[in-house]
Design a protein with these regions (language model features):
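Beta-strand-rich binding/interaction modules
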Residues: 103, 115-117, 196-198, 565-604, ...
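Accessory carbohydrate-binding/adhesion or oligomerization-edge regions at the termini
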Residues: 16-72, 146, 150-159, 178-185, ...
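Catalytic beta-strand/loop cores that center a nucleophilic Ser/Cys/Thr
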Residues: 403-419, 695, 712-813, 830-864
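Short alpha-beta junction capping motif
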Residues: 664-709, 796-798, 802, 822
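Substrate-binding/catalytic cleft of secreted carbohydrate-active enzymes
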Residues: 257-527
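Accessory beta-strand-rich segments of carbohydrate-active enzymes
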Residues: 28, 34-39, 78, 83-190, ...
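N-terminal carbohydrate-binding accessory modules
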Residues: 23, 195-250, 650
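Aromatic-rich peripheral "rim/lid" segments of glycoside hydrolase catalytic domains that contact
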Residues: 344, 512-577, 850-853
Length: 864
């Protein structure tokens, strides 16, 4: 009886609260009358013959212009698209008990609007970053009324926003028309609700020197870029649960910071971020020239900034704010905006814009921190100003440090960070530096993703790319291309992130990206797909090895060692956990097929980056090339249920110096001259290492940056070298050519000397089933069948073609080992090419141009 009484009381209380809420709010979600107004001829009060469901968009309701098929590859396709005016209309009944009370219309997110009550214009707004709220007290008296809302996604904001801001761009959330989120009438303005419990990441968030601090401890921003990618709805999610899911995935991958590229997320995002402890940096909805003479633009952006700060500023997760993406224009006007915004929200930290002037202008007074890819300008071919490891070939010589320098785990960005102080001030005034849009390493797309697009966007771009690959005769390799390029991309992400962590005065990074970017030419740069789902490249735990509050780091001048020299390296620890590691043990193990060596290092209590100890490991027992793994693990620590740990692939090679005996057993040549032809006719073996021709592409070590089509255009426009555009190698590790050169199916660090000395050959004119021994994966625009190493039976002779200068590569132990392994293969019984070709046909293959598809231009907004 007591339980029943309690249940009844609870039910009555809930009904009372619900009734009280209904007495203050009228939910306007549901069916509305609707009409498209293409010619702007509809007048308020005109009967509308169609219907639409709100919250929603014309896309989600299948209104507008239908596209059955598209060859568009710049971004995803909207099967139903519309740009212009649209009318939404319904009857509302204001209760009698609202008499004498204020009445507000609340539209949580929409585009520029005009509001009509009973056919009369009562308000308008072009607030796009925050809710539109209208005081309709005079118009909405008790009784029935006709409420009409005209939404215009074709005008009403500065023209620059339509092709730039992620609040509008077709590249991600699209330029939708509609009303999303809460739609209601209310007798009071929405109240700002602060989080009950403040996450430690937000407490006393401040700057000291070149670092961020929270809760009294040094922190490091492990950030990602967010471009409003919601492929099922084509618009941002407005509910907290969706944002918990999204931010929960970010958190599981070690992310504690998100930069919202040229847009601001809704209330639900900040609520979820408050819970997860993720530091948010929204931006003004702008990417372009900060033109102080454009009063319309400046007034609009200033208003949007004020709205963002006043609407979401109470959230503890909202700690940082930027004026937009890669701005140029009036620096004085940028400083003026920041001064004004500080008066509104002095608790926030501000920067002029993410990567403003592409970093060339350096730090200016008024910036609290500097998000950039470089700190000031550098001479072409220098890297001392850089704050990330990869660039386009249009923006940095050879695509940046990772592609250019011999692989090591010592590189960092200390030189660049030391330049981060305002003009005319001293080093002591240096500001925190955050690496802008770090990584951007491409992965070949996974075409199985196509079936996941069941919403308002369809991946005709992926279908076009799949069709191109099928036409090139390599569709059967799509999965392997995806995995090989993706697994190599994963190692490149690790390297770029660790370069940041190895920089003592670096404050953080913002990845581009953990997630694929489906626009701007289709940039498949994510470790996760556009849906934030795994691509099967790594687990969350593996990723957290190098993206966590504590990361043990190997510091060595190489990945490849000789048995004579041994392994000499240092161990560092990046500790930004807010916890002392004093007295804890870092345990290291070097393993091959079994344990090689192990040891322990006691750790101090130091915060930030510190050197923990030295490693000197004897490798003299290795008489054959061997791949090893070094594991670093900190005992008695826990992050997501496991201790902080990190692993590194390393290689050891015998100190061979003389390959002349093997070379004497085979004809080695760089041209198919009379001597080589004679040897083939005699049934001998020939190793051909031809020079580069116009049928070759360059040797790119990393996977291509961002998107080949776009940066090909930019490079050509700026008269810069175009990137080779490739995505790493694909091979069979069990092939006998690798008996003396351990490898995986994909590129890894030991391939550097060979690939940098290479010029892969276009083999499009070979048979459909022909596959090189070592294939180079081409990008989605060209789809060439590229060969690094391939073989033919020519008459009685056998020909192995290597499109790399192995003599040049032999200056490194791993290059020498590869050359030796190739020579051992060509002189063994394993060398038995299955593809027969005549000498004449081979010569044609090496000289006949291939059919090249036209690659359309694709420009960027930023002025390179």
């Amino acid at each position: 009886m007591k339980k029943l009484t309690t249940l009844l009381l609870m039910t009555v209380l809930c009904l009372h609260v619900q009734a009280e809420d209904q007495s203050k709010h009228i939910n306007l979600s549901g069916t509305w009358q609707f009409a498209l107004d293409r010619q702007a001829t509809i007048k308020a009060g005109d009967p509308l013959t169609d219907t639409i469901l709100l919250p929603g968009t014309t896309d989600t309701n299948k209104k507008g212009d239908f596209t059955a098929k598209s060859e568009e590859t710049t971004f995803l396709t909207r099967p139903w698209s519309y740009k212009g005016r649209a009318w939404y209309q319904r009857e509302v009944v204001i209760p009698a008990n609202w008499k004498g009370k204020a009445v507000y219309l609340f539209l949580e997110r929409t585009k520029p609007t005009e509001i009509y009550v009973d056919g009369k214009l009562v308000g308008s707004s072009n607030d796009i970053s925050t809710p539109q709220v209208f005081n309709l007290t005079k118009s909405l008296t008790p009784g029935k009324h006709q409420l009409s809302i005209m939404v215009d996604n074709g005008s009403g904001v500065p023209k620059q926003l339509y092709e730039s801001s992620h609040a509008y761009t077709e590249s991600t959330q699209t330029n939708w028309n509609g009303i999303i989120g809460r739609i209601e009438l209310s007798t009071s303005l929405p109240a700002a609700t602060a989080a009950k419990d403040i996450h430690p990441n937000f407490k006393d968030f401040c700057i000291k020197g070149q670092h961020f601090y929270a809760n009294g401890h040094l922190i490091f921003l492990r950030g990602k870029h967010d471009a409003c990618v919601w492929p099922l709805t084509g618009h941002v999610a407005m509910d907290v649960e969706s944002w918990r899911d999204y931010l929960g995935t970010c958190d599981a991958y070690g992310i504690n910071h998100i930069r919202f590229h040229s847009w601001c997320p809704p209330e639900a995002a900040f609520v979820a971020a408050d819970e997860y402890g993720i530091i948010m940096q929204p931006e003004l909805p702008f990417w372009g020239s900060f033109d102080e003479k454009d009063d319309t633009l400046m007034t609009f952006l200033h208003k949007e900034g004020e709205n963002i700060l006043r609407t979401y500023g109470h959230h503890p997760s909202f700690r940082m704010f930027a004026l937009g993406n890669e701005l140029w224009g009036s620096i004085d006007k940028m400083a003026e905006f920041i001064d004004d915004f500080r008066k509104i929200a002095p608790d926030k930290l501000y920067t002029f814009g993410s990567n403003y002037y592409l970093g060339y202008q350096g730090v200016k007074k008024g910036m609290d921190y500097f998000t950039t890819c470089r700190v000031g300008g550098e001479g072409w071919g220098n890297y001392n100003t850089h704050t990330r490891g990869s660039f386009s070939f249009a923006d940095a010589d050879d695509g940046g440090m990772i592609n250019h320098f011999y692989p090591n785990t010592m590189m960092n960005f200390e030189e660049g960070c030391k330049l981060a102080f305002p003009e005319g001030s001293s080093w002591t005034k240096a500001v925190p530096v955050i690496s802008h849009e770090t990584a951007q390493f491409q992965t070949y797309p996974d075409f199985d993703e196509i079936k996941k697009y069941t919403g308002v966007l369809y991946p005709y771009n992926m279908k076009v790319f799949r069709s191109r690959l099928e036409k090139a005769g390599m569709l059967d390799q799509a999965k392997d291309f995806h995995m090989a390029s993706g697994l190599w991309s994963l190692q490149l992400y690790k390297q770029d992130i660790e370069m940041n962590l190895r920089t003592k005065n670096m404050a953080g990074f913002q990845l581009l990206d953990l997630q694929d970017y489906p626009g701007q030419g289709s940039a498949y740069v994510g470790i996760l797909d556009a849906f934030m789902d795994s691509k099967g490249l790594c687990t969350e735990r593996e990723w957290r090895q190098w993206c966590a509050p504590v990361v043990p780091l190997l510091v060595a001048d190489r990945f490849c060692f000789t048995n004579e020299d041994g392994l000499h390296a240092w161990v560092q620890v990046a500790n930004y956990s807010g916890q002392s590691l004093n007295g804890k043990t870092l345990r290291w193990e070097l393993t091959g097929t079994s344990l090689v060596s192990s040891g322990e290092i006691k750790l101090p209590s130091t915060e930030g980056l510190f050197t923990a100890g030295e490693l000197k490991i004897d490798l003299s027992a290795f008489t054959n090339p061997t791949q090893l793994q070094l594991s670093l693990c900190i005992d008695d620590t826990e992050y997501f249920g496991a201790p902080y740990h990190n692993t590194y692939d390393l290689w050891v090679y015998p100190s061979w110096s003389d390959l002349s005996k093997l070379e004497s057993m085979v004809t080695v040549t760089n041209k198919l001259d009379e001597v080589a032809i004679s040897q083939l006719e005699k049934g001998k073996s020939v190793l051909l290492m031809p020079d580069s021709t116009n049928l070759c592409v360059g040797g790119l070590f990393t996977t291509d940056y961002w998107n080949f089509r776009m940066f090909k255009t930019i490079s050509e426009n700026n008269k810069k070298q175009v990137s080779p555009g490739t995505l790493g190698i694909l091979t069979d590790p069990k092939h006998p050519i690798f008996k003396g050169f351990p490898t995986q199916m994909h590129t890894n660090w030991q391939w550097f000397p060979v690939i940098k000395a290479s010029h892969p050959m276009m083999l499009d004119n070979t048979g459909k089933d022909f596959r090189p021994i070592v294939q180079v994966i081409d990008n989605i625009e060209r789809n060439h069948k590229l060969g690094l190493i391939f073989e033919f039976q020519i008459g009685k002779g056998k020909l192995l073609v290597c499109m790399a200068d192995l003599e040049a590569a032999s200056s490194y132990p791993e290059g020498r080992a590869f050359y030796r392994s190739v020579l051992q293969y060509i002189t063994s019984e394993d060398f038995a090419p299955k593809t027969h070709i005549t000498l004449e046909d081979f010569q044609k293959l090496m000289t006949t141009p291939v059919v090249e598809g036209k690659i359309g231009e694709l420009n960027n907004i930023s002025p390179y």
